[in-house]
């Protein structure tokens, strides 16, 4: 932005359209107003409470409780610090109306509440001056605009379409807030604000002044073209407008009056400006351009003319126009003479600078010779340093080759030792594998022996149970035999008594009784023999039990020893990876001794089984 003028009306129009979309989203009832409570509720979803309340105060300064679109736009521009842009574009009456005067005697005037375009009044009462106002209708204005279009047809034809587009943009901006006749007021106010801001002159260096070339040799056209060329050259280019665009803005409905007599003085000013340009182009130290200087004079006259009221300016304009132009011409002639004197002084300065330049050239030549001498000495020193570095480098190469040879010999020796260690490791690995296999085989044998021992223990337990049963049966048989013997003894006594009784009455049955007595005696002897045999059997059984107990105790003792050796073998197997070769050999010998003892124990068990119960070794299906 430049000042208070938005650089592009299309951008302002697009921004207002976006604000309208936001306004429609917040307008929940679609009645053209936003309730402040609803707006605060929406704002609390995206910001803090204090900031939302301050924003609502900006949008509703009068605390009406609702916000229309105009207040919404003014609040947004006020928060962004750009409220003056909206006011200037919409013709808001914030600044008092002030007249503006140009060098050719025109006054630009826009007042508050004016419904038509601003009026330009000529200060010189010539009969060629024609005044048109809004009360006379559009007839005179159409004639005047046709004259201006014919004068600027060849040089500014393309800018006329841009002026039309600008008017359309301004009408679009006004249409956001006003309807009907108010739109015309907004357009005229916006155009007047553009003119008022464009007359704020700034110096941006030299620029090109583009003059119109008339398409026909009519005197009025020439004077009009020059007059508009002066207007275009006296406006700044910093606001994004070229002189042709500004002239087209003046050719639009902002210019209602044109004075051909006033342009004669303008032609004189243009000649003086041309002389100033030539002097400035030839001057070695240019400070300010002629166009910028003319702008400063125009701004000074504009500022001085804006101090009085509109009525005083109209009253004094006729008397002061000639005096002001004469003073300006004299002032410009004085400045031209001063610039010519400055040009002469600059010529003397130029000759002096040439002499100093000659002296400096000689000094440069001397310094170049000194530099050549220094370069020669530097090359000699460089050659000496290179020679010294080559010698040092050759010595380092020799030392390096010797060290590399020693290191290669050491590496070869280490490789041989490494190969020997690899062979030893392979051999030890093979021995370790063999020992592991032997250990596994002995472990399997020990497991088999343990299983067989378990079977023998089960068999012994069964035999003991069977022996106990036999003893119990024998005891029962013995008791039954004793009872039988007692019965036989009682029967024998009874028979003896019967025999005695029978002998007493007669001796006829003596032979039969004797034979019966002998049978009884033989029976008693047999009973005694059975009793004796049973006692011997009982003794043999006791001896068998004692022998079986001894065998069992011996087997348990041997099993304990074998289990202890097996545990030791397991611990040895756990340490076999960290043991040395001698330790492995000792462990192997100890394992072989354990295996030999285990074989002897197995042989003893087999012999004992063959002696006492060979049926155990029989294979049963």
Swiss-Prot record:
Residues 225-243 have a biased composition (Polar residues). One of its GO terms (cellular component) is endosome. SMART domains: EFh. Isoform 1 is predominantly expressed in neural tissues. Isoform B is expressed ubiquitously. In the developing retina, it is expressed in progenitors throughout the retina at early stages and becomes restricted to the ganglion cell layer and ciliary marginal zone as differentiation proceeds. The keyword Transmembrane does not apply. Residues 151-161 have a biased composition (Low complexity). Residues 132-172, 203-243 are annotated as: Disordered. Residues 558-620 form the FIP-RBD domain. Residues 162-172 have a biased composition (Basic and acidic residues). Residues 348-556 form a coiled coil. Acts as a regulator of endocytic traffic by participating in membrane delivery. Required for the abscission step in cytokinesis, possibly by acting as an 'address tag' delivering recycling endosome membranes to the cleavage furrow during late cytokinesis. May play a role in differentiation during retinal development. Homodimer. Forms a complex with Rab11 (rab11a or rab11b) and arf6. This is Rab11 family-interacting protein 4A. It comes from Danio rerio.
């Amino acid at each position: 932005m430049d000042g208070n003028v938005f650089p592009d009306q299309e951008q302002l129009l697009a921004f207002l359209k976006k604000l309208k979309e936001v306004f429609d989203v917040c307008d929940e009832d679609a009645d053209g107003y936003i309730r402040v409570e609803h707006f605060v509720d929406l704002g609390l979803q995206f910001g803090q409470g204090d900031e939302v309340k301050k924003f609502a105060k900006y949008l509703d300064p009068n605390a009406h409780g609702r916000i229309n679109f105009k207040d919404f736009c003014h609040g947004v521009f006020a928060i962004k610090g750009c409220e003056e842009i909206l006011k200037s574009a919409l013709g808001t009456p914030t600044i008092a109306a002030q007249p503006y005067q140009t060098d050719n005697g025109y006054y630009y005037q826009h007042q508050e509440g004016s419904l038509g375009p601003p009026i330009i009044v000529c200060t010189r009462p010539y009969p060629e001056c024609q005044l048109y106002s809004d009360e006379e209708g559009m007839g005179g204005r159409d004639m005047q605009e046709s004259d201006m279009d014919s004068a600027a047809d060849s040089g500014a034809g393309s800018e006329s379409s841009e002026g039309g587009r600008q008017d359309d943009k301004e009408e679009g901006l006004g249409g956001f807030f006003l309807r009907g006749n108010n739109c015309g007021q907004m357009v005229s106010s916006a155009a007047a604000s553009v003119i008022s801001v464009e007359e704020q002159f700034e110096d941006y260096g030299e620029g090109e002044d583009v003059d119109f070339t008339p398409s026909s040799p009519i005197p009025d056209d020439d004077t009009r073209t020059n007059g508009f060329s002066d207007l275009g050259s006296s406006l700044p280019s910093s606001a994004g407008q070229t002189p042709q665009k500004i002239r087209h803005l003046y050719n639009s409905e902002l210019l209602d009056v044109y004075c051909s007599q006033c342009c004669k003085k303008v032609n004189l000013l243009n000649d003086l400006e041309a002389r100033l340009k030539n002097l400035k182009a030839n001057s070695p130290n240019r400070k300010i351009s002629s166009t910028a200087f003319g702008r400063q004079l125009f701004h000074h006259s504009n500022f001085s003319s804006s101090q009085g009221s509109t009525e005083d300016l109209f009253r004094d304009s006729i008397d002061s126009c000639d005096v002001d132009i004469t003073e300006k011409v004299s002032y410009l002639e004085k400045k031209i003479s001063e610039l010519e004197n400055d040009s002469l002084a600059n010529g003397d300065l130029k000759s002096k600078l040439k002499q100093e330049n000659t002296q400096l050239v000689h000094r440069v030549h001397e310094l170049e010779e000194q530099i050549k001498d220094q370069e020669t000495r530097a090359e000699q020193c460089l050659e000496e340093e290179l020679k010294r570095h080559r010698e040092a480098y050759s010595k380092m190469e020799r030392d390096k080759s010797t060290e590399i040879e020693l290191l290669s010999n050491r590496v070869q020796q280490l490789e041989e030792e490494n190969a020997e260690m690899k062979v030893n490791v392979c051999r030890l690995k093979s021995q370790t594998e063999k020992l592991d296999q032997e250990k596994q085989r002995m472990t399997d044998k020990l497991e088999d022996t343990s299983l067989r021992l378990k079977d023998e223990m089960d068999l012994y337990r069964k035999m003991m149970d069977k022996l106990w049963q036999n003893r119990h049966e024998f005891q029962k048989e013995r008791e039954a035999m004793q009872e039988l013997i007692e019965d036989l003894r009682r029967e024998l006594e009874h028979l003896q008594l019967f025999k005695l009784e029978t002998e007493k009455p007669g001796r006829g049955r003596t032979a039969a009784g004797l034979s019966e007595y002998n049978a009884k005696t033989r029976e008693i002897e047999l009973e005694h023999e059975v009793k004796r045999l049973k006692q011997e059997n009982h003794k043999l059984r006791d001896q068998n039990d004692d022998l079986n107990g001894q065998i069992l105790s011996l087997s348990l003792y041997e099993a304990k020893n074998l289990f202890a050796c097996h545990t030791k073998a397991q611990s040895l197997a756990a340490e076999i990876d960290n043991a040395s070769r001698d330790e492995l050999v000792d462990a192997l010998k100890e394992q072989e001794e354990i295996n030999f003892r285990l074989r002897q124990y197995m042989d003893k068990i087999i012999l004992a089984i063959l002696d006492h119960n060979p049926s155990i070794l029989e294979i049963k299906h």
